[in-house]
């Protein structure tokens, strides 16, 4: 049975602003268990900071750098009804590890979900998609 983006996507995408420090972005990624953070400006999504971008910046005064200094300006997006196999091809062709799913209503510039290589591997293994866990309640 063919799977679609909506079947394997992880709902929720961490975001930051252009001036967010790389140290703060690293904290967001760690807290959200995310491979990337979408950079937002006043119109919508304008870039992506990936784990690779952070690691590449680590030796070069990363504590002085912000999202705009290291982000990839291209945010690849797909619709929820795209075939998972087509998305896998796109990711390989574009040399990216994730693509983002935009809100289904027109004019929304903020991604609502993400498809990662990990999600595709989980699908290949016959595992359920990763879903965000509710926060633990402290007693």
Segments predicted by a language model, with ranges:
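Tandem CBS (Bateman) regulatory domains
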Residues: 1-12, 50-96, 110-139
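The feature marks the first
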Residues: 2-10, 14-24, 28, 32, ...
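Glycine-rich beta-to-alpha transition loops that act as phosphate-gripper elements at the mouths
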Residues: 18-19, 80-84, 102-104
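A glycine-centered beta-loop-beta connector
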Residues: 29-32, 37-52, 91, 99-119
């Amino acid at each position: 049975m063919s799977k679609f983006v909506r079947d394997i996507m992880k709902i929720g995408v961490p975001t930051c602003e252009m001036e967010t420090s790389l140290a703060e972005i690293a904290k967001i990624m760690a807290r959200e268990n995310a491979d990337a953070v979408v950079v937002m400006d006043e119109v919508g999504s304008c870039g992506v900071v990936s784990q690779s971008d952070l690691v590449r910046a680590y030796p070069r005064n990363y504590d002085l750098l912000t999202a705009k200094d290291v982000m990839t300006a291209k945010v690849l997006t797909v619709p929820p009804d795209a075939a998972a196999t087509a998305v896998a091809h796109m990711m390989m062709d574009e040399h990216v590890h994730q693509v983002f799913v935009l809100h289904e209503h027109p004019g929304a510039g903020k991604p609502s979900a993400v498809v990662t290589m990990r999600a595709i591997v989980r699908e290949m293994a016959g595992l359920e998609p990763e879903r965000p866990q509710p926060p633990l309640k402290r007693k």
